[in-house]
Amino acid sequence: MEELDFSSKTTTSRLKLFGFSVDGEEDFSDQSVKTNLSSVSPERGEFPAGSSGRSGGGVRSRGGGGGGGERKYECQYCCREFGNSQALGGHQNAHKKERQQLKRAQLQATRNAAANFSNAGSASQFLRNPIVSAFAPPPHLLSSSAVPQPMGGPWMYLPRVSPSQLHVSHGCVIQDGSGGAGAGGFSYEYGARDSGFGVVGAQMRHVQAHGPRPSVNGFSREVGTTFDDGLGLDLHLSLAPAGH
């Protein structure tokens, strides 16, 4: 009996190497089958017995969990979609460069406008009235002391004629150079006479500061002839031919 028990114990004992039994051919073949089943790809749906299939569920959520299958990256400037983050980053960098160039151009334009405004500040009063600015000199070029004062000279060239022989034709105003330049001015008296031409002639009185006030009393034939002879002109109307 003891020999039989010993033989049964020796036959039932197994030798294991790294957790695998190497004594029985049947056990070794079963273990190899299990390892082959565990190495099969989970995408084909072949999972070993007792496995929960977690790896297959991750692939489904990545591949078609939401129905699209691909993640989109949208640009915050133009709302354009890209397939990866690298393409989106390069696209947004281009947007940033364009915005920097635009800001630089705006700053340069603002500086130029400020410089032009400061340079034209002295002439701003002439910009309100362009007609005045065309004829009036700038105030900073000529001071009040440097502006020449108007001289009381004759307004037109006349031959030497005595003050009593002044003749005014066609309402012209003539200032005598012999009179005082600081006179109070001129006073005019217009009157109409009976003729076919309506208003005929005018009377002018030259006011002087000192001395008598000579006046022109109408149009006399003698004074008019003397004045016209001095200029070499004949301004009298006549129906007779010239020279008579």
From Swiss-Prot:
Consequence of gene loss (knockout): Decreased number of trichomes in cauline leaves, lateral branches, sepals and main stems.
Cellular compartment(s): Nucleus
Biased composition range(s): Polar residues: 30-41
Region spans: Disordered: 26-69
Main location: nucleus
GO cellular component: nucleus
GO molecular function: DNA-binding transcription factor activity; transcription cis-regulatory region binding; zinc ion binding
UniProt entry keywords in alphabetical sequence: Cytokinin signaling pathway, Developmental protein, Differentiation, Gibberellin signaling pathway, Metal-binding, Nucleus, Transcription, Transcription regulation, Zinc, Zinc-finger
SUPFAM superfamilies for the chain: beta-beta-alpha zinc fingers
Zinc finger (C2H2-type): 73-95
GO terms under biological process: cytokinin-activated signaling pathway; gibberellic acid mediated signaling pathway; glucosinolate metabolic process; regulation of DNA-templated transcription; trichome morphogenesis
Note: Plants over-expressing GIS3 have increased trichome densities in sepals, cauline leaves, lateral branches, main inflorescence stems, and have ectopic trichomes on carpels.
Protein name per Swiss-Prot or TrEMBL: Zinc finger protein GIS3
Organism, as annotated: Arabidopsis thaliana (Mouse-ear cress)
Upper taxonomic lineage: Eukaryota, Viridiplantae, Streptophyta, Embryophyta, Tracheophyta
